[in-house]
Amino acid sequence: MKILIKSWLFFLILFVWGCSMNKQITKIDSMQSIDYQLPVEYTTIDKDMKLAYTEMGKGSETLLFIHGLGSYIPSWKKNLESLQKKYHCIAIDLPGYGKSSKGNYSVSMDFFAETILKFCEQKHLDKVVLVGHSMGGQIAMATALKYPQLVKKIVLIAPAGFETFNKGEKQWFRDAMSV
């Protein structure tokens, strides 16, 4: 009985303490207002597509980091800080994500692979090492298959496969990831 009373008392104290936390949650108006704590640059791909990216390190080999679904540049922060000592590191926000342009993009692997190609052409990059996590791994694979001349190596971190999504699933992802 004492254990039961002590347990209830513990949970009651925990509940009251949790309810008394007066932490304000700041509403984010847009991704532009988020401080990445990394230098952010922009480049325009095609007409109205602006890509956000961060670039650091001076190594001779370029690592191009591609985030996963629902992610953005800061997910690579610790990797960038460490790897910039030896490599030229670039992390991008894919179209529709983070600080990059939002639009009615096709969100297919071919679209993202072509975006990676155009970004690399603009930056005069060739023989890059594509580093992709989750959907970014899927994009890295698609890019390497479609544009092998661009890619030296790929590094896959818990990559997605080559799933296909129906129209409703694609719309759900768009709605869920839009701010």
Give the residues covered by each predicted segment:
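Alpha/beta-hydrolase fold catalytic core
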Residues: 2-61, 86-87, 125-126
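Conserved Rossmann-like nucleotide-binding pocket used by diverse enzymes
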Residues: 15, 65, 90, 131, ...
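Active-site loop/oxyanion-hole signature of alpha/beta-hydrolase fold enzymes
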Residues: 43-47, 54, 91-131
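Conserved HGGG/HGGXW glycine-rich cap/lid loop of the alpha/beta-hydrolase fold
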Residues: 49, 55-99
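Conserved alpha/beta-hydrolase "nucleophile elbow" surrounding the catalytic nucleophile
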Residues: 67-69, 128, 132-137
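Conserved catalytic-core motifs of eukaryotic protein kinase domains, centered on the activation segment
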Residues: 75-77, 100-106, 165-168
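Short, hydrophobic alpha-helix immediately C-terminal to the catalytic nucleophile
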Residues: 77, 117, 141-145
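Flexible "cap/lid" loop of the alpha/beta hydrolase fold
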Residues: 138-146, 152-179
